[in-house]
Design a protein with these regions (language model features):
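Active-site-proximal beta-strand/loop segments in catalytic clefts of secreted hydrolases
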Residues: 14-16, 23-25, 60, 111-113, ...
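Amphipathic alpha-helical interface segments
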Residues: 122-136, 142-143
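Active-site SXXK
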Residues: 17, 37-42, 51-81, 139-144, ...
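Active-site-proximal alpha-helical segments within enzyme catalytic domains
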Residues: 135-142, 185-205
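A short, well-structured edge-of-sheet supersecondary motif
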Residues: 3-47
Length: 205
């Protein structure tokens, strides 16, 4: 009940790797109740075999992207101290070439790249923290470029296909691309698939 009151769409509780409790709320419940904050129907991207929603999980995808960066690093495809320009080329920000060159993969992961939301320069990398989804979204692009694979191909090969997250994939977000295609992809998944991901993290990968 608490999760539903906090506008959750679903919750799965695991104990020793097994489902202890599971509950879902319909996408239109908030709309019927007149609660605009509970409306998340626009995030629904389908349903799994059990009829539960597959939805864009918004900023939860940052954890997925971070794990993929770690996997790419483990394979020697990139380093955390690599300039982002090494993988994306110049011009991925609106900063000067010198300012842009100083931003590393680690800066993106720690949100200390020194960029504003529109990717203009704000501060020297590493000197200021700013929650920046637009900049963080570039981490997935970095991994894809380093691996020479599409986001869905590498995610399926490295992660979702290996641990049984069969209802998870990257999906295009209509109208979310913006001028530079920022946040153009969202990670669509289910509560059960995220539970599998949680078990992976709990087991130290």
């Amino acid at each position: 009940k608490l999760a539903g009151d906090r506008r959750a769409s679903g919750v799965v509780i695991l104990h020793r790797g097994k489902i202890l409790a599971e509950q879902y709320w319909k996408p239109d419940e908030g709309a019927r109740a007149g609660n605009k904050e509970r409306e998340y129907g626009a995030l629904v991207r389908g349903r799994d075999a059990a009829g539960q929603v597959i939805e864009d999980v918004a900023s939860v995808q940052k954890s997925i992207a971070a794990i993929l960066v770690g996997m790419a690093r483990h394979q020697g495809l990139l380093g955390l101290d690599d300039p982002v320009t090494k993988h994306l080329g110049p011009g991925w920000t609106k900063a000067s070439p010198e300012q842009e060159q100083a931003i590393t993969v680690l800066h993106l992961l720690t949100m200390t790249g020194g960029l504003k939301d529109d990717l203009t320069f704000e501060a020297a990398p590493g000197t200021r923290w700013r929650y920046n989804s637009a900049a963080y979204a570039r981490t997935l692009q970095v991994v894809a470029a380093a691996a020479k694979k599409t986001p869905n191909a590498l995610t399926r090969e490295w992660l979702t296909g290996r641990i049984g997250m069969g209802d998870s994939s990257w999906v295009e977000r209509a109208g979310a691309g913006g001028e530079a295609g920022l946040n153009a992809l969202g990670f669509a998944t289910t509560a059960r698939d995220l539970a599998r991901f949680g078990l992976l993290i709990l087991a130290d990968g």
